[in-house]
A protein has these predicted regions:
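C-terminal alpha-helical interaction appendages
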Residues: 1-65
Length: 65
């Protein structure tokens, strides 16, 4: 069953909303590829956190004069 923002895996509930949204998106894609749920959650959370950090750094670089 795919996860949603309203019903994410328990381990994603405390992530910031933007990170949780990305993690749910990634986890659902991994599940569609028949990955084990626990592994999909771990990978999706790590990738979503990395994505958020990259986005933050990109915005900061764009804001520099």
């Amino acid at each position: 069953m795919p996860w949603t923002m309203d019903h994410p895996p328990a381990s994603m509930r405390n992530l910031p909303p933007k990170v949780r949204r990305k993690a749910v998106e990634i986890a659902n894609a991994l599940l569609a590829e028949r990955m084990d749920e626990a592994k999909a959650i771990r990978i999706a959370t790590a990738k979503a956190r990395a994505w958020a950090l990259h986005e933050q750094r990109r915005r900061e670089a764009d804001a520099e004069p």
